[in-house]
Amino acid sequence: SIAIPPLGCGNGGLNWDLVKKMIIEALENTEAEIYIFEPNTDIKQALQTKSAGKDIKLTPSRGLITYAMYYYDSLGEDCSLFVANKLAYFLQRQGSQAFAKIKFQAHHYGPYSHQIDHLVYDLNGSYIKGFEQMNATAFEPLTMQHERRDEISKYVRTLDQQEQNSLKATIDLISGFESTLALEVLA
């Protein structure tokens, strides 16, 4: 027997209906029992509820990226892994020591780092929702928990001046570029 997961339909962002059809067509003449496991949104929703309210220790990188994401989200644009990567890249370019060691690589949509995925995952359940199981496409919206925004603002004010300046410079830089395409071009 063969068990097949929903290939490419998590982080890959592929349409499950098309993928399932391709799998069935490719394996229809196979003389084995085949089990195809479909994506399950109920699991993701249950995990969102379960992880809500967890507390994490704030660090400069967590505080800065969360503040920048709150700012971006408050402009009416959805935050996503794509947005988080671009904001982190800009923070690094603006001199933030908290992001100095992050290694960005050229990717489909500009600079990208898997380290940012882990940073966003750490924030999930406390400051954002939508990244349970580290499973979201680049542009899948992440829900910001705005009721904790004041906490982040207070934390950022405790950071050294260089970090605060890099955050201000990043916010100034993205002003007028509040869309995913504009962020990509800017990066």
Language-model-detected regions and their locations in the chain:
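Short, histidine-centered active-site or binding-site loop motifs used for metal coordination
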Residues: 6-8, 69
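Mid-sequence acidic-hydrophobic segments that form the walls
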Residues: 10, 26-29
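Short catalytic/ligand-binding loop motif for oxyanion handling, primarily in non-cytosolic enzymes
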Residues: 10-14, 44-45
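A glycine- and small-aliphatic-rich helix-loop capping segment at beta-alpha/alpha-beta transitions
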Residues: 18-27
